[in-house]
Design a protein with these regions (language model features):
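Bacterial Sec-dependent N-terminal signal peptides
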Residues: 1-35, 388-390
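A non-transmembrane, solvent-exposed segment enriched in polar/low-complexity residues
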Residues: 25-172
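Short, small/polar residue-rich loop motifs at catalytic or cofactor-binding pockets
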Residues: 55-56, 241, 264, 351-353
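N-terminal targeting signals for export/organelle localization
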Residues: 86-96, 106-107, 115-116, 167-241, ...
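N-terminal "domain-start" segment that seeds a small globular fold
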Residues: 224-258, 329-332, 379-389
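Conserved redox-active cysteine motifs that mediate thiol-disulfide chemistry
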Residues: 265-266, 270-287
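Structural microenvironment flanking redox-active thiols in thiol-disulfide oxidoreductases
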Residues: 280-322, 333-344
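Thiol/disulfide oxidoreductase modules built on the thioredoxin-like
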Residues: 321, 331-387
Length: 390
């Protein structure tokens, strides 16, 4: 997995002068995006956006005399990708930008090689997004030197270590985002940006923010997405019944969560071979396992390495964690949405790695650590309490 860049492969493969309409059923209001481009050095420009029914639109138009126009139908604001001839697959490409489309007439002025500085008029959501970005701009400028080192690092593990230096900057920007959410409960920008915060929130925190929104935002596609994610998070939080699963382990043996019901406490460790914090935490996990295994603790490693099986097996050997059971998450990028909803990570509301879920002998979740839960110190305390009693 490439940790360095968000890619847009789906946007740059097979870019033809046609519009793809998938599941395009509920849109009812017209929009126009009329644009002008300076320093033009390519002939075509492209627009891609998702639609509430689950499909997407991929449109293209030819630039004539420095002008272009897109037309379509929407029933609510959506984030769209606008791009010309790209030099890379990164969203940092100089000919790529994101815009908030609304079902109204809009204009945009861009300069080839400087798409991120595009000027958009007519979209209220875009205006709100601009305000939010201006508030975070000073922090982003401070962060830029580290970000540049990160971009240029070719080793994924080293890049992940550099990425850890982002944390204080991200914390400052999170604070700005949450203040914006509180002051803009009727903004599509709030619901859209909330999608990127779910990994750091527990179900109560996420629900509190969601409940502050207007009905209009709750009923938007972004609002419905957040509601569904909160439900998944609740399913993987203390007090909920642990979702059942069954899979072949690393040795080809069938493993089912139900095998341990009534017999052992189970700690599910959601991790991956490429996850530096996961790997750094393995020595501590080994000490926990050795301390409590005879008292009735079982660990199950669930790895997000379905496309890197060899790396998964190598990491288990290198980190000496083959002493407990290991399975893959079951991820398949070609699966249907219904099939994806059955993934172990999805059923437990896993948004970030590492995350650990502690399950008692009755199959009830009694702890969540990392990824919207408590820290490892709380996990250690909980385990000590359990096994001092038992």
């Amino acid at each position: 997995m490439n940790l360095k860049h968000l890619t847009i492969k789906s946007l740059i493969s097979g870019l033809l002068s046609l519009t793809y309409l998938v599941g395009y059923g509920q849109q009812k209001d017209n929009f126009t995006l009329s644009g002008k481009i300076k320093k033009q050095n390519f002939d075509w420009i492209y627009l891609r956006y998702n639609i509430p029914s689950g499909g997407f639109v991929l449109d293209s138009t030819k630039i004539i005399n420095g002008k272009f126009q897109f037309k379509g139908r929407l029933n609510e604001p959506v984030v769209a990708s606008l791009y010309g001839k790209m030099k890379s697959q990164s969203m940092d490409d100089p000919n790529f930008t994101s815009v908030f489309l609304e079902p109204v007439p809009m204009t945009i002025d861009v300069t080839a090689g400087e798409f991120m500085n595009a000027s958009i008029k007519g979209s209220q959501s875009q205006d709100e997004q601009k305000i939010l970005e201006q508030l975070k701009a000073p922090t982003r400028r401070e962060m830029e030197p580290i970000l540049e080192i990160y971009r240029n690092e070719k080793n994924n593990e080293k890049a992940a270590e550099i990425k850890e230096q982002f944390e204080p900057f991200n914390a400052r920007m999170d604070k700005i985002d949450y203040a914006f959410f509180a002051s803009h409960p009727d903004s599509y920008v709030t619901a859209y940006m909330m999608r990127f915060k779910m990994s750091g929130l527990n179900s109560n925190q996420a629900t509190k923010i969601y409940n502050s929104w207007t009905d209009r935002i709750k009923q938007s596609s972004y609002g419905k997405y957040i509601a569904a994610e909160i439900k998944k998070l609740e399913n993987g939080s203390p007090g909920s019944t642990a979702a059942p699963f069954s899979a072949k382990d690393i040795n080809g043996e069938q493993l089912s969560l139900s095998d341990f019901k009534g017999k052992k406490y189970v700690l599910i460790d959601f991790w991956a071979s490429w996850c530096v914090p996961c790997r750094k935490g393995n020595p501590h996990l080994i000490s926990i396992y050795n301390k409590y295994k005879e008292s009735g603790l079982e660990i199950i490693g669930v790895a997000s390495d379905d496309t890197a099986v060899d790396a998964w097996k190598k990491a288990i050997v290198q980190d000496k964690i083959g002493i407990w059971r290991h399975i893959l998450s079951g991820y398949n990028r070609n699966a249907s949405e219904q099939e994806k909803s059955a993934y172990i990570n999805v059923r437990y509301g896993i948004h970030t790695l590492p995350t650990k879920i502690l399950i008692d002998k009755n199959g009830i979740i009694i702890g969540r650590y990392g990824g919207g839960g408590e820290d490892d110190a709380a996990m250690d305390k909980k385990l000590a309490e359990i096994f001092s009693i038992n």
